[in-house]
Amino acid sequence: MMRREDEEEEGTMMKAKGDLEMKEEEEISETGELVGPFVSAMPTPMPHNKGTRFSEAWEYFHLAPARAGHHPNQYATCRLCGRQVSRGPGVNVGTTALWKHLKSMHREELEKSGHGQAGQRQDPRPHGPQLPTGIEGNWGRLLEQVGTMALWASQREKEVLRRERAVEWRERAVEKRERALEEVERAILEMKWKVRAEKEACQREKELPAAVHPFHFV
């Protein structure tokens, strides 16, 4: 008899405790503020890496009650509109989704508080190696210079080839002139030889009758 009364009393206490928790959860979803025992669940802004500053997004959010089948830190409640925003599955989740919600729904509030550009410097988790600032411009200028040098080299090579061909043409022209001069000189020598031969023949013809008839004119 006493045991049954104890069990009934314990069941009544458990039911009252459950009703109290449900009431507190309803107050959370309606006002967006934590009350009762959930105040201790107020999230302390967690840095993503040691030595980094706390995210300013937590000025506008607090962790929502855990949902069945989800990580306790997955959902956060917006203090401005009371909506619950998913931060993504897993443990090491950032505040990117929170900043997106603030920028899309409460941009004016962010600008008033001076946090309009704050989301851009949060969650510095690069997916790959960061290139130095301006590296693309430097590469562009370098490629442009290389292209200019290649074009200049190509034009220079064409100019050299053109000059070489011009020199070859001039050399062939000089050779032709030299051969023509040699032919002219040879022709002149032949003419001289012919003229000399003719003179000698004439001279012999003149001397021949005088030798045959020495007293012909006496």
Swiss-Prot record:
Annotated InterPro entries: ZBED2/3, Znf_BED, Znf_C2H2_sf
Biased composition (Basic and acidic residues): 105-114
Subcellular location: Nucleus
Keyword DNA-binding: yes
Keywords, in A-Z order: DNA-binding, Metal-binding, Nucleus, Repressor, Transcription, Transcription regulation, Zinc, Zinc-finger
Gene Ontology biological process: negative regulation of transcription by RNA polymerase II; positive regulation of keratinocyte differentiation
Source organism, top-level taxon: Eukaryota
Region annotation Disordered: where it falls in the sequence: 1-24, 104-137
An example Gene Ontology molecular-function term: RNA polymerase II transcription regulatory region sequence-specific DNA binding
One Gene Ontology cellular component annotation held by this UniProt entry: nucleus
Tissue expression pattern: Expressed in keratinocytes.
BED-type zinc finger segments: 52-113
Residues annotated for Zn(2+) binding in this entry: C78, C81, H101, H106
Biased composition (Acidic residues): 1-11
Up-regulation conditions: Induced by TGF-beta.
Function: Transcriptional regulator which has intrinsic repressor activity and which competes with the transcriptional activator IRF1 for binding to the 5'-[CA]GAA[AC]C[CT]-3' consensus sequence in gene promoters. May thereby play a role in keratinocyte differentiation.
The name this protein goes by in its record: Zinc finger BED domain-containing protein 2
Gene field: ZBED2
